[in-house]
């Protein structure tokens, strides 16, 4: 059978986070390519709990988006509680960032995704493929243009210290950073 895999190769099933179903936050978690040998090989040994059958009729290319879609969905839908009319800024136009932008827009939020000039091809995917507003400059202006307080939600999909600093600067009081 064709399958897709989760990335949590090793978890502590008895940890408090794993027991509540949040094994992705287990402090002892090791992922493929990070703590455990990666999967860029012909064969890889994967725990059965990580595997999910690809339904008939779903292409491998589409199925390959399962894990990043789940990460983005969890961040935006489960954790950010985005509502229609919110203003959301996504930092980082990689696959997960673009998918976060999609789920944010799908939730009814006015959404912009931020990248560097060197991210032009990724920003083009966000703009053309997902109809997201893209920014390489004017980020502060966009964040503060409505009422001067900042955006409701910042999704940090870049994961570097500079993006966290920017998120803190741009989120409104009582806003959310994920």
Language-model features, listed with the residues they occupy:
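Glycine-rich cofactor phosphate-binding loops and adjacent beta1-alpha1 units
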Residues: 80-82, 128-178
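Glycine/charged-rich beta-loop-alpha catalytic/anionic-binding loops adjacent to active sites
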Residues: 50-61, 149
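Redox-cofactor binding/interface segments in oxidoreductases and associated redox assembly factors
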Residues: 5, 90, 156
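Short glycine-centered segments of the SAM/dcSAM-binding site in methyltransferase folds
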Residues: 2, 87, 175-176
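Glycine-rich phosphate/adenylate-binding loop and adjacent beta-alpha elements
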Residues: 1-51
């Amino acid at each position: 059978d064709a399958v897709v895999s989760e990335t949590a190769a090793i978890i502590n099933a008895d940890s408090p986070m794993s027991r509540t179903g949040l094994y992705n936050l287990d402090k002892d978690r090791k992922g493929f390519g990070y703590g455990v040998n990666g999967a860029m090989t012909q064969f890889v040994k994967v725990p059965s709990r990580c595997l999910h059958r690809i339904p008939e009729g779903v292409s491998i290319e589409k199925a390959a988006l399962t894990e990043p879609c789940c990460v983005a969905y969890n961040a935006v839908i489960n954790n950010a509680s985005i509502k229609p009319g919110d203003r959301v800024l996504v930092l980082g136009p990689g696959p997960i960032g673009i998918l976060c932008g999609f789920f944010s827009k799908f939730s009814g939020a006015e959404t912009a995704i931020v990248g560097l000039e060197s991210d032009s091809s990724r920003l083009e995917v966000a703009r053309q493929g997902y109809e997201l507003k893209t920014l390489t400059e004017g980020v502060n202006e966009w964040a503060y243009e409505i009422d001067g307080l900042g955006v409701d939600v910042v999704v940090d999909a870049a994961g570097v210290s500079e993006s966290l600093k920017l998120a803190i600067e741009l989120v409104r009081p009582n806003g959310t950073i994920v």
